[in-house]
Amino acid sequence: MASVSELACIYSALILHDDEVTVTEDKINALIKAAGVSVEPFWPGLFAKALANVNIGSLICNVGAGGPAPAAGAAPAGGAAPSTAAAPAEEKKVEAKKEESEESEDDMGFGLFD
């Protein structure tokens, strides 16, 4: 978990970015002093150097992005469309699977002492 010193520097950097001010060690120190937080002297310089060549706006926007989404199932390549007779059979299979899964969800494994 982040320490108070780290959080103070992070919030200072976010405030500076929000005000469209360049993030520097001196400006981080000024905000931390104004907030009345005591921070080890190396933290503001560390954050200023780490954020010097980083686009903070894109960093904020991509925080939750875990990478590209998996591709959807491919469409059948060329050829005729599947027959309509096969579609109802597939629907019955899907319904049967849904019923089975609902039954298994209702059980929840409490039958051990029945």
Curated annotation (Swiss-Prot):
Keyword Acetylation: yes
Biased composition (Low complexity): 69-88
Entry keywords, A to Z: Acetylation, Isopeptide bond, Phosphoprotein, Ribonucleoprotein, Ribosomal protein, Ubl conjugation
Keyword Nucleotidyltransferase applies: no
Disulfide bonds: none
Pfam families documented for this protein: Ribosomal_60s
UniProt function note: Plays an important role in the elongation step of protein synthesis.
Subunit structure as annotated in this protein's UniProt entry: Heterodimer with RPLP2 at the lateral ribosomal stalk of the large ribosomal subunit.
Name of the featured protein: Large ribosomal subunit protein P1
Organism: Mus musculus (Mouse)
Gene coding for it: Rplp1
